[in-house]
């Protein structure tokens, strides 16, 4: 996924939790915050844009968090920050 600058900035408060998910393969982000992150990326109707519509399985959630973190890293590296 490719993030806009606005999305990247909105996701910064979650960066440590996303990094932890990637390095430890463990998800510590509360579900409410995870849903907020999905809304930042996909918009208000995020549940119609991803499958499954609500990733409740730990592995699916972890996989998405790692993908989001990787996208944040790519944005940071491409913007020179």
Give names to the regions the model predicted.
Residues 4, 27-31, 81:
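Alpha-helix initiation/capping motif
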Residues 16-71:
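Acidic, low-complexity, intrinsically disordered interaction modules
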Residues 75-81:
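Short acidic DE-rich linear segments
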Residues 1-25:
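Short terminal alpha-helical segments
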């Amino acid at each position: 996924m490719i993030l806009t600058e606005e999305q990247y900035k909105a996701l910064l408060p979650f960066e440590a939790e996303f990094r932890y998910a990637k390095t430890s393969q463990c998800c510590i982000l509360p579900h409410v915050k995870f849903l907020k992150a999905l809304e930042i990326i996909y918009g208000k109707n995020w549940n119609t844009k991803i499958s499954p519509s609500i990733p409740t399985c730990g592995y699916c959630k972890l996989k998405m968090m790692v993908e989001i973190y990787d996208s944040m890293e790519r944005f940071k590296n491409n913007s020179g920050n």
